């Protein structure tokens, strides 16, 4: 029985007579069966990787699974023959609320590639019921509401497995749900998500407010609950320990079932710690091994040879440090082990910068990972060099053999084959070769760089994608885009270092320039998508400024025909899949030295956008691949920025006082036009922040940014030249396949 026959049997009625909801449910169950039939990926070496992460931003799964199972076209045609549109079926599916930004999306891409390469490897995380939050805009401000996603018809499978997780005053029994991870034309792996049976979604009050002390009911409600107070920090510790204790118990259970001796755990298991959230897996594994009779020395040796750590940030505040008394309040049984680990480090090294427990009695999670793991990797070439030379230099001096780079990547199944089917058709027509499993074949596109027919066809694909975005946004939110405008897009987590505020200053420049009578040759549409953490006031204030500008420009008849600002609500994977194929100018404007890698830059590049960015993160490698003519780089270098911080010689007020243009742009934030629309206090605070602090040096780079962006828009008018830039970017994007990244992890770290 083929897939279509199984689908019809599961549905139990004629497709033409079924609702979209019924068809979706039948497809989901048929895909689950097909994934089971594919069988699990099994390592010939008897070795398995477990990828532990606080978040997995997996996106909707139906189409991705149909593509990986090789039945997407078959299903699409079957539905069409019965008067059904597969795109409408896809809209029925809720997006899982299991992630936030690049960290979680990377984890999802990695799981896809691990399965596609046929490696034995599973993800381990938590089953958040309400996600980060659903973003709505009210009075030009972000408001957070719960984002429930779990339905009776779900990709989650109840495994019947659970473990007891001990805390100081009580224990909780977990419940394990699995989601199948299908490999492209290969076997399947699993994403293991742990939950509690007593979770209660009804305890959430106004917005996303809830009792943070009620651990038995709130533990798996939200991803990254507000940690701006002690209760929030304690809840984060509860969550992290619940995740790693379940993960560690599950790993040992699997090993024992396979008949492995736990004394040889490191021969059969590798645990990849994705950022610092899962770091307590190190002392927890040691605790569980010593409880089974293994000596402390041996347990430490085993765990050190089992765990590997990926660093994802250069921002010091993101390297988690928990007060000892907080850990004592939640997991006192771990503290003797953590103290033992810290004592061994202190006995060997007298440098305070490498101590696990610092002089303020805080436990540094990343330091524990580096001392008691066998690998430390950065996620882009520049990032890894900064870790070795600056941020983690004391550790590199001790353990140079542990440090390695693994430049991030993205899965082309989702970010090309699923979300940009028209571009795939163009690639197939112009003879790229089998890029679906070998992304390096994209280089074959360079043969078309002087083919005017191919160039025009590529421009037409982009135009069709812009029109598709226009239609989608109008249908979903009533926003009307001008699809003849240039689409300039910045979509990423809202953070000062990503510098959405600098984009704001460009918009102000352009608004004032148009008001002065300087009309652009072509309309410009600036699109933002971003959520700000609920307690991150400045980030929320930046959203407020963007939304105020959106209204100001929309209602100004002198400017609206030439400039549009749109901030999409509740930016998520589904929205990214619509925005990225339509993008023409990719905004990657973080302060040099602050973005570890970025993966949005790769997705845009793959879909034919041209990058406007700083020499930061993976932008550096994009620049090296495409050359000076096919990317727009501005701003000071990472070395210059690091020197500014070292010397404390950047003073934002000097730029404000000494440059009339910068002063005009910044002051417009508190102009009568803006004050009439926005909240006065908020606008005053952002204005003061830019002049008095500006920790991420917006005013340092803004003039160069404005001038470079004007050059981008001028160059855009030479359509053939622009199409050639598009081809080069697409052709060179093959390096950024997560299949390549995972192959490198396996070659150098996992050896699965």
Question: Which sequence ranges carry the predicted segments?
Answer:
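A conserved ligand/cofactor-binding region detector
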Residues: 1-752
């Amino acid at each position: 029985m083929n897939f279509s026959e199984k689908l019809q049997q599961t549905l139990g009625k004629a497709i033409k007579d079924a609702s979209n909801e019924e068809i979706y449910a039948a497809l989901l169950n048929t895909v689950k069966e097909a994934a089971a039939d594919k069988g699990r990926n099994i390592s010939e070496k008897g070795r398995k990787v477990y990828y532990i992460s606080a978040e997995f931003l997996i996106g909707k799964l139906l189409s991705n699974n149909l593509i990986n199972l090789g039945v997407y076209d078959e299903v699409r045609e079957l539905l069409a023959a019965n008067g059904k549109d597969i795109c409408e079926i896809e809209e029925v599916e809720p997006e899982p609320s299991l992630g936030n930004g690049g960290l979680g999306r990377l984890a999802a891409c990695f799981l896809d590639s691990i399965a596609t390469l046929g490696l034995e490897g599973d993800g381990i995380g938590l089953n958040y019921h309400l996600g980060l939050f659903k973003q709505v805009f009210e009075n030009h401000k972000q408001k957070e509401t719960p984002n429930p996603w779990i339905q009776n018809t779900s990709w989650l499978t109840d495994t019947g497995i659970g473990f007891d997780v001990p805390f100081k005053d009580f224990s909780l029994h977990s419940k394990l749900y699995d989601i199948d991870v299908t490999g492209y034309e290969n076997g399947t792996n699993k994403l293991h998500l742990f939950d509690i049976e007593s979770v209660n979604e009804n305890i959430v009050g106004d917005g996303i407010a809830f009792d943070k002390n009620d651990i038995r009911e709130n533990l798996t409600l939200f991803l990254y609950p507000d940690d701006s107070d002690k209760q929030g920090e304690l809840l984060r510790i509860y969550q992290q320990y619940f995740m790693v204790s379940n993960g560690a118990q599950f790993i040992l259970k699997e090993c024992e079932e396979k008949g492995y001796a736990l004394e040889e755990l490191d021969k059969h298991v590798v645990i990849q710690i994705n950022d610092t959230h899962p770091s307590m897996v190190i002392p927890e594994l040691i605790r569980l091994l010593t409880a089974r009779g293994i000596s402390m020395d041996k347990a430490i040796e085993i765990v050190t040879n089992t765990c590997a750590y990926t660093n994802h940030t250069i921002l010091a505040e993101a390297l988690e440090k928990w007060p000892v008394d907080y850990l004592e309040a939640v997991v006192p049984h771990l503290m003797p082990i953590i103290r033992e680990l810290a004592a061994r480090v202190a006995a060997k090294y007298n440098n305070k910068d490498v101590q696990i427990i610092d002089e303020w009695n805080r436990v540094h999670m990343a330091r524990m990972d580096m001392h008691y793991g066998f690998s430390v990797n950065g996620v882009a070439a520049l990032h890894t060099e900064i870790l070795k030379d600056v941020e983690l230099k004391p550790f590199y001096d001790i353990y140079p053999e542990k440090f390695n780079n693994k430049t991030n990547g993205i899965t082309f199944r989702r970010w090309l084959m699923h979300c940009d089917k028209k571009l795939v058709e163009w690639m197939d027509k112009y003879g790229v070769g089998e890029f679906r499993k070998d992304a390096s074949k994209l280089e074959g596109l360079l043969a078309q760089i002087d083919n005017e027919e191919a160039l025009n066809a590529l421009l037409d694909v982009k135009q069709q994608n812009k029109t598709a975005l226009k239609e989608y946004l109008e249908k979903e939110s009533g926003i009307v885009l001008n699809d003849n405008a240039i689409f300039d897009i910045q979509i990423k987590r809202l953070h000062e270092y990503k510098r959405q505020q600098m984009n704001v200053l460009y918009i102000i420049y352009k608004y004032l320039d148009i008001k002065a009578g300087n009309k652009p040759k072509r309309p410009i549409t600036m699109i933002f998508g971003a959520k700000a953490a609920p307690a991150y006031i400045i980030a929320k204030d930046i959203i407020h400024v963007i939304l105020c500008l959106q209204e100001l420009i929309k209602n100004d008849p002198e400017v609206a025909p030439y400039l549009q600002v749109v901030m999409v609500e509740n930016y998520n994977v589904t929205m990214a899949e619509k925005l990225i194929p339509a993008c023409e100018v990719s905004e990657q404007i973080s302060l040099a030295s602050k973005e570890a890698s970025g993966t949005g830059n790769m997705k845009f590049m793959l879909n034919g956008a041209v990058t406007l960015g700083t020499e930061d993160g993976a932008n550096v490698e994009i620049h090296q691949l495409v050359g000076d003519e096919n990317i727009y780089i501005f701003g000071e270098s990472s070395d210059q920025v690091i020197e500014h911080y070292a010397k404390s010689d950047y003073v934002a007020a000097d730029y404000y006082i000494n440059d009339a243009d910068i002063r005009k742009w910044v002051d417009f934030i508190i102009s009568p036009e803006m004050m009439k629309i926005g909240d006065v206090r908020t606008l005053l605070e952002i204005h003061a922040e830019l002049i008095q602090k500006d920790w991420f040096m917006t005013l340092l780079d803004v003039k160069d940014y404005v001038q470079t962006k004007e050059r981008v828009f001028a160059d855009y008018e030479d359509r053939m030249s622009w199409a050639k830039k598009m081809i080069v970017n697409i052709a060179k994007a093959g390096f950024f396949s997560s299949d390549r990244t995972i192959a490198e992890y396996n070659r150098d770290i996992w050896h699965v």
